[in-house]
């Protein structure tokens, strides 16, 4: 779950920007897209291969 605490002198726009970045980094939207639609075995293989490549980079 992405969580952002807003500071006293921080604007809403910058907090929203940080929240969007945290959501994209956590991969929440990609999970939602995957759950919403049927995933074929080929798509599942490609997704897992991409996850493996990402984890190797870090």
UniProtKB/Swiss-Prot annotation:
Residues covered by region (Disordered): 31-58
Any one of the GO BP annotations: translation
GO cellular component: ribonucleoprotein complex; ribosome
Keyword presence, Thylakoid: no
Family matches, as InterPro entries: Ribosomal_bS21, Ribosomal_bS21_CS, Ribosomal_bS21_sf
Alphabetical keyword list: Ribonucleoprotein, Ribosomal protein
GO molecular function: structural constituent of ribosome
Residues annotated as signal peptide: none
Keyword Ribonucleoprotein attributed: yes
Composition-biased stretches (Basic residues): 45-58
Tree of life domain: Bacteria
Family: Belongs to the bacterial ribosomal protein bS21 family.
Protein name, per record: Small ribosomal subunit protein bS21
Source species: Prochlorococcus marinus (strain MIT 9313)
Gene: rpsU
């Amino acid at each position: 779950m992405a969580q952002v605490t807003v500071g006293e002198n921080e604007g809403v726009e910058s907090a929203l920007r940080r929240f969007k970045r945290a959501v994209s980094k956590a991969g929440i939207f990609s999970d939602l897209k995957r759950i919403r639609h049927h995933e074929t075995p080929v798509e599942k293989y490609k997704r897992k291969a991409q996850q493996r490549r990402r984890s190797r980079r870090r």
